[in-house]
Amino acid sequence: MTTPVAFEYPAAAAGLTEPLVRQVVLSFYEKVRGDAVLGPVFAAAIGGDWDPHIERIMLFWLTATRLKRGYHGRNFMPAHLKNPAIRPDQLPRWLELFRETAAGQCTPQAASALVDIAERMAETLAIGLKRRDAAP
């Protein structure tokens, strides 16, 4: 009889923990709020009450890293596509802030695991936004 091999997600193997992911997410969104490019887009979409959004995003990231199961929301794409203020040219800035935050708070291995997830999200969102913007 063979022993099943447990699948270990790269983020967990990279040394990510729930407190670290929470710290990165909170720090990242503080930067976003103060950013000249992204701040106004997020402020218009979220309004004045950031707490519910932050908690939803926190659960998303904890689920994406497989540190916790708790995000039961929809795919992130529809909410972003319906907002015309979100444009593909903003994604490099979003990634720049995320990379900066992860690098400043994580080991290189943990930062790489988080940035990998962020890059895949940005790539997927860029494709969707370009299709949206090309639609007649």
Task: Show which residues each predicted segment covers.
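Core of compact, soluble alpha-helical bundle domains
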Residues: 1-136
